[in-house]
Amino acid sequence: MIDVNKFESMQIGLASPDKIRSWSYGEVKKPETINYRTLKPERDGLFDERIFGPTKDWECACGKYKRIRYKGIVCDRCGVEVTRSKVRRERMGHIELAAPVTHIWYFKGIPSRMGLVLDMSPRSLEEIIYFASYVVIDPGDTPMEKKQLLTEREYREKREEYGQTFNAKMGAEAIKELLQDVELDKEVAELKEDLKSAQGQKRTRAIRRLDILDAFKESGNDPAWMVMDTIPVIPPDLRPMVQLEGGRFATSDLNDLYRRVINRNNRLKRLLDLNAPSIIVQNEKRMLQEAVDALIDNGRRGRPVTGPGNRPLKSLSHMLKGKQGRFRQNLLGKRVDYSGRSVIDVGPWLKFYQCGVPREMALELFKPFVMRELVKRDMASNIKNARRKIDRQDDDVWDVLEDVIKERPVLLNRAPTLHRLGIQAFEPVLVDGKSIRLHPLVCEAYNADFDGDQMAIHVPLSDEAMAEARMLMLAAHHILAPKDGKPIVTPSQDVVLGNYYLTMEQKGREGEGMIFKDTNEVLMALQNGYVHLHSRIGIATNSFTDKPFTDDQKQKIMVTSVGKAIFNEIMPKDFPYLNEPTQDNIVNGVPDKYFIDKGEDINDYLEDAPLIDPFKKGFLSDIIAQVFKVYKVQRTSDLLDDMKTLGYTQSTNSGLTVGIADITNLKEKPEIVEAAHKKVATVSKQFRRGLITDEERHDRVIQIWNDAKDDIQQKLVDSFDPNNPISMMSDSGARGNISNFTQLAGMRGLMAAPNGGMMEVPVISNFREGLSVMEMFMSTHGARKGMTDTALKTADSGYLTRRLVDVAQDVIVREEDCGTDRGLVVSAIREGNEMIEPLYDRLVGRFTMKDVLDPKSGEVLVKRNTLMDEDTAQMIVDAGVESVTIRSVFTCNTKHGVCQKCYGRNMATGEQVEVGEAVGTVAAQSIGEPGTQLTMRNFHTGGVAGGEDITQGLPRVQEIFEARNPKGEAVITEVTGEITAIDENPAEHTREITVKGETDTRTYSVPYASSVAVAEGDHINRGERLTGGSIDPKQLIKVRDVMATENYLLSEVQKVYRMQGVDIGDKHVEVMVRQMLRKIRVMDPGDTNILPGTLLDIADFKEKNTQAIISGGIPATGRPVLLGITKASLETNSFLSAASFQETTRVLTDASIRGKNDPLIGLKENVIIGKIIPAGTGMATYRHEEPKSVGTVSDSVYSISDIEKQMKAKDGQQGDTDKK
């Protein structure tokens, strides 16, 4: 076998008959498979050992030669070579066909490749191939045309008329002769001539033909090879036949399909030998053709061949297609050894980098290592005994196991793996029981809970794999989420509740006003019962030697609470003391107002001082973010562990529970409900009198009940007791929110109706009182709709992620700096008056392209090519800067990827991105993972005048990325200028908007219903909206330029996600949008050898043009094309990646005709052939191999001087040759 890591690229082409024979080890002549008595393969059959190799290792069929010493000998009795039986997985056979047969992929695909080459319609081809019509191959001296079709009757008449002077045939033989007659060079030249004058339909057809003919010409494939004289038989172990209990056999469908081909082929041979009548022979040839069609792609033409129980047989094409096909089932997702799965359970005692593995599971996973260690320690005499010992689970194996798993990380994965944090590495700790124990803080990254979730565990085997798991994948390193750079391991639920309880303050608790010299004294007082956790006390500030207090504060006494003193013990020594939950306290230390002079009466101070809020979930998150920023990963993960332990301990001590008495009764509720009923009655009366329409009545009733519910909710909030456990849980952010509480103690309110609106009758009861049967029934619809929506959304979101990953998988950070001179001007994204994404968010972690100047003084705030961190970004925003030019993925010049400078900071680490980072995949996951949080619904404005139905949520994201025409499309202007008139045209039910530009004036007619977004006298730029709605990006790219389109798509995606409260870094969306715009459609080829209408990568287009200019020719012109992500995935340069995505047969058909070469640049194609992926540690630069040129700095667009130099050099060379 060839070493897969050695080859650079992979090419595919059409196989010639000679090629097929050269692969083959012999011809399969008989349809037999196995002798059912001896279970030995039959001679010349589909499993013949002489052709495909022995069924047992080192043993010939008759048993004359056994054992390895006869390796390579061919047995003189049975003719079988003595070798390994696994050659039966790689040796092919062939079938010599008695008549040529067309390959269905090339005849039936859309467009029909054969039809294009021959310039014939697929209909007429079908008639010829399946023996319905004759085709004239050589008209001789008759008035017939070449390629003219004749029916059986016409053929007989012509034969009578002209005799043997012309040549007409039917079937694949005829097609083969026609294909052999095609003169590629001549046809290509003629078509190129025609193109100069052709227009419309004719031109399109010519371009398509030229494309195919040119592909044949360039690739060296012969069109006649689309017709086969011989077909390959795949190795028998890839179409196995196994015996089931009860003596029956299960066999792969392919064997049935091959059998039919062989049977029909043998029958045809016999008929030809017997000189049978032509009609019988024709029928047999047609059946052979159909059998081969079924073998290659069953069901593509006519009814599929079925097996027992009317089940269509799986042909060769089906083996590749779809989720169960070879690509997705076996090449992109393999099952691996040394893995297990089990239910997960919480392990609160674990450290952040640990997980609990059940003893038995660990013993099985690490079995070989334990066996080796047992032998090494002389606890077992040999490997066999060691295995027995392990299977018996002797007592002394457990100690060995303990030693073996030290320093060996394992990987834990939870399906669905929506982003890269779905697989993380941990150090195993042996636990009792059968469940895997998971650290509670990593649950959020995995989206795991302990209600029966299962997780899979994998053991990295090689040293490199272990090192990577430990260095790159250890859970303790993954504190920030890749999608937005915010901490993902924030405490939740019990931990939040415990820390909230710990940091509460209460007036007048025991020991209030005591003053201590340091924290140890406080702890002693607490243990001895002198103070309570919530007591407010004083501590001498100078006892905190490392904390950053001001000199003034150090002389004083700090007023704090016992709980906060305990909480601050877990913080880093020199981190500011946390006394109030504000960002100011985190960054600048405790405010002066919490200090009293020594000797001042603390009780007077406490009398007036308000209680400080306890620390809630959001504040804990801010603390973690700040600690990460200052102290980096290691210290943060220690802090998280301490915070977890503290939180669990305190929530246990607090004894917080929920009882029915905690749900209070609201006294004002009956009055509010009564008042609402009266209002509803009034509205109904107005409707009956005809003062308002039914729609208005409905809207008002809904409004009345919503107001009543809000009123009750507000009253509940006002009457809250801060010590009520339910209110503590919801206030701290541990669980539940105000609307849950309203449903328990207030009223449930209005319910969704099946038609998508609201029911007018509200649910007045709450859960404390209990619902009536009627109310319960009304609630069910909304509840069920919620469940079904979630299920549908998950599938949609998963499919979106798959398409995103596919289109961006080859975007990798390839170099440090691409040297581009362009940048992206960013400012805050707004929608009307609403801020969608502030400028600050768009600057953090990006490089500046130009100097940033202070708008007031004009001085340089930030130099160009600087990485902006949080502080720099804040400074720029505070200075009042409105827009900044940054380095962006949009303007990066790196081929097949991006450079460090254009990408900026890696969100997941907070550092500059490293060369080799697979930023495309990360971007796709970051956009896809929150997909499940987006809504499914398309918002309708409910018939309010002047509003369009706009799509939002997941459907809108799909609409943007698939570049579809949006629902509720806006009309945009093609000229820049002033709006001179907006006239109504009642006859047409439209409005006419006139835009007067500098050179021309345009009038746009827009429907009455749509809202006009402009007024007379407004100045408007081309590409801006005249009406409400979404712009069609394909229109925008025509009217404006690529940059404007990219910006529009970026802000539209951000709108959808930010509306739902999901933050995603701009750069992720930029990576995706750039992939949609990486192609150019060539309009005029100039002097290049590109065909008009071809789609080319921008980089390849520039390269071809550079060559044309150097050789003194005219460059090609093209226009940028916006492709949806599905289309963009299928248009990628890698046929392997495209074939494994969708439309497998179409992609492979096209690739083989063009003789495509897959340069193996992306991740997917390398996974498919089993090569190490060229990202991360797999990049050539990191693997001590010759780096490919891809890793070097790519040339930006050639400058004129470069080109002149090259031309000079060329002239010089020519001069030299002249001299010679």
Curated annotation (Swiss-Prot):
Q: Which InterPro entries match?
A: DNA-dir_RpoC_beta_prime, DNA-dir_RpoC_beta_prime_bact, RNA_pol_asu, RNA_pol_N, RNA_pol_Rpb1_1, RNA_pol_Rpb1_3, RNA_pol_Rpb1_3_sf, RNA_pol_Rpb1_4
List residues binding Mg(2+).
Answer: 449, 451, 453
Supply the SUPFAM superfamilies for this chain.
beta and beta-prime subunits of DNA dependent RNA-polymerase
Cross-referenced CDD domains: RNAP_beta'_C, RNAP_beta'_N
Q: Name one GO biological process term.
A: DNA-templated transcription
Q: How is the cofactor bound?
A: Binds 1 Mg(2+) ion per subunit. Binds 2 Zn(2+) ions per subunit.
Q: What's the name of the protein?
A: DNA-directed RNA polymerase subunit beta'
Family to which the UniProt record says this protein belongs: Belongs to the RNA polymerase beta' chain family.
> What reactions does this protein catalyze?
RNA(n) + a ribonucleoside 5'-triphosphate = RNA(n+1) + diphosphate
Q: What does this protein do?
A: DNA-dependent RNA polymerase catalyzes the transcription of DNA into RNA using the four ribonucleoside triphosphates as substrates.
